[in-house]
C-alpha cells in the first residue's frame, strides 16, 4: 500500500488535477487510518513508515500549492463534501478521523500555502486595489486624474506623463499624503524624471483635474503636488510650502506644479528641488513666502531654478528644459491647454488674482529672470501659474483661494 501510495505521488507530479489531489487526499486519509490502527496495535514501525509516506504526500501537496496558485481552487474543489469547510475542512474532512493533524498540515500546506499565494496575489493586487482604493478614496483626485487624463489629452506632453502620473495620482491622489509621501519619496528618489513627470503630471493632473476641484483637490493634490512635486523640494520646500501649504501650497503647490509642475515642476520641483539643491537660494525661497514676494522668490527661484535647471540639475534642467521646452510648449500649450480646459483658465481666472500676480510675477520673472523669465515667458502660463502661486503667496493666492 505504501509503495502504491508512494508511486501514486510521483505519478501525480506530472499532472496536477483535482482528481490527483483528491486521490492524494484519499490516500492520506487512508494512511492516517492505517497509522491510527497501527498505533492502537502498538506497531510503531508501520506507523513510522506510513507517517513518512504521509509526510511526503503532504510535502507534495504543499509543493503543488506553492507551484500552482490554482491549487487553491483545486484543493477546495475535490472534497465537495467539505467544500463549505474550505481546504482546511477539506483536508480534515478528507482525513477527518484524527487526520486533524494531517488536516491541519494539509490545511497549512494545501490551504495555507495557496492562501499565501493568494495573499501574495492579493498583496500584489492589494497595492493595485490600494491605488484604486486610494483613487477611489480621493474621487476628486480620481476626477483630477480623469481631468489630468483629459488635461493630458489636451496637453500631449502630459498625456504620457499624465497617464504615468495618473497612475501616480491614483495612488498619490488617493492616498495623497501617504502615497504622496511615498510618491514623494519615490519622486525624490527620481526627483527629476519621476517627479518631473509624475509629480508634474500628477500635479498637473491635480492641477488640471484638480483645477476644477482645484482648491479642493489642489489642496489634496497640492499636498501631493506640493508634496509630490515639491516633495523633493518640499522638505526644503516645506518651509516654503508651509507658508503656502495653508493655502498657497495647495494652490501654489499645484500652481507651481501646475504651471511650475509643468514648468515649475521643473520650477516647482526645481523650486523644491532647488530648495533642496539650492536650500540657500531656496532657503530664501523656502522662506521667501515672506521674501517670496515676486522678486525674492523669483530671484531665488529663478536663480536657484536657473542654477537648478542650468546648474543644479543640468540634466534635470536640460531634462526640465527639454521637458520644459516640451513643457514650455506643453505648458505654453498647457496655457493654451489650460485655457482650452477652461477649467484651468477658470482656475487661472481663479488664479486670475494669482494670474494677475503671475502677470506681475511673470513680468517680474520675465523681467527678473530673463533666462528663467524668458523660459517662463514661454511658460508664462505655467510660470504665471507658478507666479500665481507666488501671487497667492502674495495674497493673490488668497484671492485664488477665495
Curated annotation (Swiss-Prot):
A motif (SH3-binding) lies at residues 377-385. InterPro entries: SS18_N. A motif (SH2-binding) lies at residues 50-53, 359-362, 397-400. Residues 92-106, 196-224, 311-379, 390-402 have a biased composition (Low complexity). It holds the Pfam family SSXT. GO terms for biological process: chromatin organization; dendrite development; positive regulation of dendrite morphogenesis; positive regulation of DNA-templated transcription; positive regulation of transcription by RNA polymerase II. Keywords: Activator, Calcium, Centromere, Chromatin regulator, Chromosome, Kinetochore, Nucleus, Repeat, Transcription, Transcription regulation. Belongs to the SS18 family. Homodimer. Dimerization may be necessary for its function in neuronal dendritic development. Interacts (via C-terminus) with CREBBP (via N-terminus), EP300 and SMARCA4/BRG1. Interacts with the nBAF complex. Association with CREBBP facilitates transcription while the association with SMARCA4/BRG1 suppresses CREST-mediated transcription in resting neurons. This is Calcium-responsive transactivator. It comes from Bos taurus (Bovine). The lineage of its organism: Eukaryota, Metazoa, Chordata, Craniata, Vertebrata. The gene is SS18L1.
Amino acid at each position: 500500500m505504501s509503495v502504491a501510495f508512494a508511486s501514486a505521488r510521483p505519478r501525480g507530479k506530472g499532472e496536477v488535477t483535482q482528481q490527483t489531489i483528491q486521490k492524494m487526499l484519499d490516500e492520506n486519509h487512508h494512511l492516517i487510518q492505517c497509522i491510527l490502527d497501527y498505533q492502537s496495535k502498538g506497531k510503531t514501525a508501520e506507523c513510522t513508515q506510513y507517517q513518512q509516506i504521509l509526510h511526503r504526500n503532504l510535502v507534495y501537496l504543499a509543493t503543488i500549492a506553492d507551484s500552482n496558485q490554482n491549487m487553491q481552487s483545486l484543493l477546495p474543489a475535490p472534497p465537495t463534501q467539505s467544500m463549505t469547510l474550505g481546504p482546511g475542512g477539506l483536508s480534515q474532512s478528507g482525513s477527518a478521523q484524527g487526520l486533524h493533524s494531517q488536516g491541519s498540515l494539509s490545511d497549512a500546506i494545501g490551504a495555507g500555502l495557496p492562501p499565501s499565494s493568494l495573499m501574495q496575489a492579493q498583496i500584489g493586487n492589494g497595492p493595485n486595489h490600494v491605488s484604486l482604493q486610494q483613487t477611489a478614496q480621493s474621487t476628486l483626485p480620481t476626477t483630477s486624474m480623469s481631468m489630468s487624463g483629459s488635461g493630458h489629452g489636451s496637453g500631449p506632453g502630459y498625456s504620457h506623463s499624465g497617464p504615468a502620473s495618473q497612475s501616480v495620482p491614483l495612488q498619490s491622489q488617493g492616498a495623497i499624503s501617504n502615497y504622496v509621501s511615498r510618491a514623494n519619496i519615490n519622486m525624490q528618489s527620481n526627483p527629476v524624471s519621476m517627479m518631473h513627470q509624475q509629480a508634474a503630471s500628477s500635479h498637473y493632473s491635480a492641477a488640471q483635474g484638480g483645477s476644477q476641484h482645484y482648491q479642493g483637490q489642489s489642496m489634496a493634490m497640492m499636498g501631493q503636488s506640493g508634496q509630490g512635486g515639491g516633495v523633493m523640494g518640499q522638505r526644503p520646500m516645506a518651509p516654503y510650502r508651509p507658508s503656502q501649504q495653508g493655502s498657497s501650497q495647495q494652490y501654489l503647490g499645484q500652481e507651481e506644479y501646475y504651471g511650475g509642475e509643468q514648468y515649475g515642476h521643473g520650477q516647482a520641483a526645481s523650486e523644491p528641488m532647488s530648495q533642496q539643491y539650492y536650500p540657500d537660494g531656496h532657503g530664501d525661497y523656502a522662506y521667501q513666502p515672506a521674501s517670496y514676494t515676486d522678486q525674492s522668490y523669483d530671484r531665488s527661484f529663478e536663480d536657484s531654478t536657473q542654477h537648478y535647471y542650468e546648474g543644479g540639475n543640468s540634466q534635470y534642467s536640460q531634462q526640465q528644459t527639454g521637458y520644459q521646452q516640451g513643457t514650455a510648449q506643453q505648458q505654453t500649450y498647457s496655457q493654451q491647454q489650460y485655457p482650452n480646459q477652461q477649467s484651468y483658465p477658470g482656475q487661472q481666472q481663479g488664479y486670475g488674482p494669482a494670474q494677475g500676480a503671475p502677470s506681475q510675477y511673470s513680468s517680474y520673472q520675465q523681467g527678473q529672470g530673463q533666462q528663467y523669465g524668458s523660459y517662463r515667458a514661454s511658460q508664462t502660463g505655467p510660470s504665471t501659474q507658478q507666479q500665481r502661486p507666488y501671487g497667492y503667496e502674495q495674497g493673490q493666492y488668497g484671492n485664488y483661494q477665495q
